[in-house]
Amino acid sequence: LQICPMLLNLLLLLFLAGVCTACPKECECDVSPTTNETVSAYCGKGGLDDSKLTVLLHSLPSGIRSLEISTPSWRPANSFRWNDNLNRFSSLRQLRLIGCGMPSLSRPRLPNLELLDVSNNRIDHATMANFAGFPALKVLDLSNNKLSVLPTGVFAYLKKLTSLSLANNSITEASSNILRGLENLRTLRLDRNRIPVGHLNDLISDVRSLEELGMGGCHVNPLSNLSLDRLPELRSIDLSSNNLKRVPSAELAALPRLTSLSLAFNRIDEIEPCAFCGNNLTKLDLSHNKLGLRGKILKEEAFDGTSLTHLDLGFNHIENFDSTTIGVAQRTLKSLSLSGNYLTTFDAASTRTLHALTSLHLAHNMISDFPLVFPPEYYQLKVLNLSSNQLYYLPDNLGSLLGNLKEFDLSHNRLKSLSTASAEFIDTIDQVYLAGNPWDCNCGLQQLQEHMRQRFALRRQLEYGATRCSTPEILKGQAILSAVAVNDCAVLFGARYGLSQSGELLVLLGALLIAGALLVVLLLLLYYGRERQYKGSYVTRECSRTPLTMTLPPHGITGISCSTSSSSTSDPSEVNNLSPPLPPPPPKAMSALYFGV
């Protein structure tokens, strides 16, 4: 009788544990190791509408702290409106509803929410009521929507807001006080909006504590019209896609605390000497410009007055880069990007003086082979990006050449398989990007799957969903992480050359057949050679016999003739004269009797 209550309690505990860890089939959930409760959920299978979203939200435990609903490009898109069932997640700290087709935000009530990301939707208006239910909100991302007008006081309730992104909308008009009262705001992104310069100056006047400002694609050319001197604390500014033809040195001089600058996607074709004097720049982005079209990329003393640690020269017109051209930055540079610059090799000149380099980006080039030996600076690298090249194999000695690597991007190359040595090297690296390669899942799948399982928490960052099988046909298009292994592994040498077990056996069989055929031909040649040699030596012995050793042939049988064709025409009498006389025949028996013998 006492056992029954114990069993009931056990069943109740199991039921509660199942409820706490319940995860819908559309999602992937992370469970707390201490409380065994679901703390976060990522729902990325797509195809959600209003009714499916309601069912999904009811199936999630109410105590989750992080929820993301988004979908990769290859899956069906989501399309739903804001659902008030989200209000049941009172402990929610982070909410991401990305690319879900939402037209508005309704009136949510999430008192503990700190991050809200509703980017890539169809939100075309916003009011104070939309944000009144987020008193603890610190990060708000409204980028890539259809906002055109922001009314007065729209963000008045977000007193704790530190980061706001309005990038990639259609904002053409902004009230002068929409940012007033946001004393904690440190990051503001206004990229690719057609806001008049006068309105921009009014906006930034209300947030003088701003440290990061995004103005990419805002058509603020000339930059002198923008009152940057109103932001004395500014440390990072994005001026990309503003049709700039030169570095705005004079305007940047008004920002003494500036450490990060992006001039990407402009029309700059050269960097003048002392172009960044007056700033303490450590990070500079010059990608997607016209550097290299006019010969020399950089002029001497171009980076004087800086302490650069990160330099991006990607997607210019640089075919040969010499690290000595960056002047004083050689001593401090830790990260260099030469992506998209028509490079074909790992040129030693590009890194030979960069002794502090730890991160190198060579993506989107035309590199197809690894060298036998890397330049010595490569051994100290911790990050190496080789994505979108033409690499088709990894050498077995890569571990001895890149011994300190922590992040390795090999995505979007032509890799089909990994040898045992290269797979062991991959296992020593914390983050490896392998998506977008035509993987052959006939062999070596278990080792690659085990590598991914060990880094399952980083599956979205490392794009494991896009790391898919290309062959065999039965597994084509399946994610490697969930594919069923096919045991077709090479045993001897095939893994080194990307051969399957059947391919390796065919090569071995062909080699055996060729070796057998060559052996038969060799034996036949030896046999016929020995036979001809034996016949020749026999005739020579017969001709070299002396008269004493030669026995007479029987009567009526002609002996062996060793004479040449020329001697056969000579006189027979001459031959007889040269031959010794034959011994006389023995006496007859009758004559012996006559003499009384």
Language model: regions and residue ranges:
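Extracellular leucine-rich repeat
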Residues: 7-597
